[in-house]
Amino acid sequence: MHESAIVLAAFGVGHPRSLPGITKVVERVRQSFAPTPVRLAFTSQQIRRIWRSRLTRPLWVKEHPEVPSEVLMVRGPLATIADLHEEGFREIVVQSLHIYAGEEFEDLRSCLRGLASIQAVKPRWTPFRRLALGRPALGQPGIEHPYPQDLERAALALAPDLDQADEQGAALVYVGHGNPYYPSGVYQELEMVLRRTHPASLVAVGEVEGAFSLDYVRERLRQMGTQRVLLKPLMLVAGEHAHSDLAGEDAGSWRRTLESQGLKVECDLRGLGENPAWAEIYLENIRQAAASAGIAL
């Protein structure tokens, strides 16, 4: 029996149409690390409750055959790791599917630290031999994996999006989730890398929640002098933020606001998880986390 397993920890999403940003990554990881078991977990309790409530509605489940059972019955990282322990797995790599090392990632890291600290009186009963946490796509602070290199890697994965905008004669505007309580300056560092690696392209990176808001992006677009905008979520999935805050019909959405300024706006509502090159970032982070912890997958 395999004694190692992989847990993919995403924030989660509640709408079935947005699931490919997650399920495509899960599928890719399973293909790459077979026969190592791969489990999905959502860090958002609110999202988990949404799916759990749907389990009590058989008609809804029947009408949405595209939703995998592992999503309908999704659990949090702590419960998922506990389930694996009960099944006999003592070496686990938890890969964060978050974009950057923000609040959700720090909470996940704290959870793993707590589990790793458990020591039984008799060593053979210590729950886990090894626990490892794979860093987010845009890296994390520290010297083991310098995050500027992760930004370069991310920029390479995003190159097709800049090509798409260039073909349209448009400025590419990425919109991340952000966080009003946690630093998100890595978005602007990513923008700087994209501008340096694609000097002929017009690009800006904003966030729904945080300092680099729509006002920041509007000023950047004014400086560029562009008339066309390609708006894309810098998120694993194109969920509620993408469909409402970015592309919604409400007058306050990013699309409607930019259109009111005379700009022609196209929205490409595909999550980063649907980009094979972005999924490959997580695969590489899993390999590196496992190797650093001495876990064989």
Where do the model's predicted regions map?
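Active-site-proximal alpha-helix that buttresses catalytic centers in soluble enzyme cores
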Residues: 1-297
